[in-house]
Regions:
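Pyridoxal 5′-phosphate
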Residues: 2-7, 12-428
Length: 428
C-alpha cells in the first residue's frame, strides 16, 4: 500500500524507477529520425546561391519572403518533426513522461547541450519561457532597496526594462534610463560605447542592463570591455539581453564576463515558441531569490533549477531545444556565420547606391550583426511595410516616430541575393 505521506514527486520517481531506462529509450526513435535528417543536411555545392535550397527545409508559405527573424524565427521542418515526436510520445503515457525520471534525464541532457552552445556551465542555465520572464526573475529576485540604482540606455528593449520599473515602485530603488545617440551608431567605436556607459554610472549603480545586440539597429555591444569597466567601477551585476544574439552570432558567455545573460530561443535559434534561457553566473546565484512558488521546491535547493517554473508545462518544447541547437551547429559548419555577414554586406551596398536611403546601423562588422536598419525618405515606413506584405509577401519590421523612419531587416541563411534585389526593386 502506498505511503500517503510520501511527497508526490518522490512517489513518482520511486514508482517509475524500474521503468526509467526503458522509458528513456523510448526517445531514441525520435532522436534517431532527427539525426538521420541532420546528417544529410548540407548546402548545395552548385549554383550561384548554394544556400537557396535551405528554404525547402522550412515551413514558410511559398508566397512569403521573410526578412523578420529578429522579431520571431521560423522552425526548420526537421526540428518541428522532432517536437511533434516528443509530444506524441508524451501523450502515450502523460504521467510517466511529464513527471518522472525519464523526462528529468532528457531535460538535463538539453540543459547540458544549451550550456555547451552558449559557453557556460550546465549549473548556470535556467529554462525560462522567454527573455522578458528572465528579466522579471532578476528584477524581482535581486535584493535591491532604496538607494540602489539600475541603469540602462534607450536602446534597451521593453522586455528587459519594464520589470525593473515595476519592482522599483514597490521596493524603492531607482531606475535611470539614459539616451543612447542612435543616429551616431554608424560612426561609433567600441571605446565610444564603453565611455558612454561609464559616463552614466554613479556610485549607487548596482545593476547595469544592456543588450548584446539591440533590436533597433543591430549594434553589437563590446560586452567584455563594458563588463570589466562596470565591475571595476563598483557595479555589482551586469545583466544582458541576448535575445538577438544567441543563434545569430557565436556566443561564449563565460568569456564575456557578465553576471546574467537572457535569451529567447524562438528567434535566431529557430526553436519552438515558449522556450528561453537565462545564464546566471555561479557566484551571482546566491544574490537572487527565487520568485516562483511551486511544489517540491526543496528538492532543487542549491541548484539553478530553483529559479524555474516547475508547474506543468509543455516539456516537448524544452527537449526540442537540443535539436534546434544541433541544427544551428550544423549550419555553422556549412558557413552560416559567413553567409549572414555576406547578406548584410549585400544589403549595405544596395543602400549605398540609393540616395533616398540611409544606412543606420554599424559599419564595422565587429560592432554589427544580421539585423540592420535603413532610413527612408519621402514615405512612411509603416505604409511601405504594409504594401510590401499585402502585395508582394515581404515581411520586415518598420519603425516610425520621433524623427525616426526606418525599415528594419533581419535576414537569415536561407534568404537570398535575389530576394534582396527584388526588395530594393519594389522599394524604388
Amino acid at each position: 500500500m502506498p505511503d500517503k505521506n510520501l511527497p508526490r514527486r518522490a512517489f513518482l520517481i520511486q514508482a517509475s524507477a524500474a521503468l526509467g531506462a526503458g522509458a528513456l529509450a523510448a526517445f531514441a526513435p525520435v532522436q534517431q529520425a532527427f539525426a538521420a535528417q541532420l546528417n544529410n543536411l548540407s548546402v548545395s555545392a552548385g549554383g550561384s546561391d548554394p544556400f537557396a535550397d535551405l528554404r525547402q527545409k522550412y515551413l514558410l508559405a511559398p508566397d512569403v519572403t521573410y526578412f523578420n527573424h529578429g522579431s520571431i524565427g521560423t522552425i526548420p521542418r526537421m526540428v518541428q518533426q522532432a517536437r511533434q515526436g516528443y509530444l506524441d510520445l508524451c501523450e502515450t503515457n502523460p504521467w510517466l513522461y511529464m513527471w518522472s525520471k525519464p523526462w528529468d534525464e532528457a531535460r538535463a541532457h538539453t540543459r547540458a547541450i544549451a550550456a555547451g552552445f552558449m559557453g557556460c556551465g550546465a549549473d548556470e542555465v535556467v529554462f525560462t519561457h522567454n527573455t522578458t520572464e528572465a528579466f522579471s526573475l532578476l528584477a524581482g529576485g535581486l535584493d535591491l532597496q532604496a538607494g540602489d540604482e539600475v541603469v540602462f540606455s534607450s536602446m534597451n528593449h521593453s522586455g528587459a526594462s519594464v520589470a525593473w520599473f515595476h519592482y522599483a515602485r514597490t521596493r524603492g530603488f531607482s531606475v535611470r534610463k539614459f539616451d543612447f545617440p542612435i543616429r551616431d551608431v554608424p560612426t561609433l567605436t567600441a571605446d565610444d560605447i564603453v565611455a558612454l556607459c561609464r559616463e552614466n554610472l554613479t556610485d549607487r549603480t548596482r545593476v547595469l542592463v544592456l543588450p548584446h545586440i539591440d533590436n533597433l539597429v543591430g549594434l553589437r555591444h563590446p560586452l567584455r570591455k563594458i563588463a570589466d569597466m562596470a565591475h571595476s567601477h563598483g557595479v555589482e551585476f551586469v545583466a544582458v539581453d541576448g535575445a538577438q544574439s544567441v543563434g545569430m552570432i557565436p556566443v561564449n558567455i563565460t568569456n564575456l564576463g557578465v553576471d546574467f545573460y537572457a535569451t529567447s530561443a524562438h528567434k535566431w535559434l529557430q526553436a519552438p515558441k515558449g522556450v528561453g534561457l537565462l545564464y546566471m553566473r555561479k557566484r551571482a546565484q546566491a544574490s537572487v531569490r527565487p520568485i516562483w512558488v511551486t511544489w517540491g521546491q526543496k528538492s532543487w535547493a542549491g541548484s539553478v533549477q530553483i529559479f524555474e517554473d516547475y508547474g506543468t508545462r509543455n516539456l516537448a518544447e524544452v527537449l526540442t531545444l537540443s535539436d534546434a541547437i544541433a541544427f544551428q551547429k550544423r549550419l555553422e559548419t556549412q558557413g552560416a556565420v559567413q553567409r549572414k555577414r555576406a547578406l548584410r554586406d549585400y544589403v549595405r551596398q544596395a543602400v549605398a547606391s540609393r540616395p533616398n536611403l540611409t544606412w543606420r546601423s554599424p559599419t564595422e562588422w565587429d560592432l554589427a550583426s544580421s539585423l540592420y536598419s535603413i532610413g527612408l525618405q519621402g514615405r512612411d515606413s509603416r505604409e511601405v511595410s504594409r504594401d510590401m506584405f499585402q502585395n508582394h509577401g515581404y515581411v520586415f519590421r518598420p519603425f516610425h516616430g520621433d524623427d525616426w523612419n526606418t525599415l528594419r531587416l533581419s535576414l537569415n541563411v536561407f534568404n537570398t541575393e535575389k530576394e534582396i534585389d527584388r526588395f530594393f526593386e519594389l522599394l524604388g
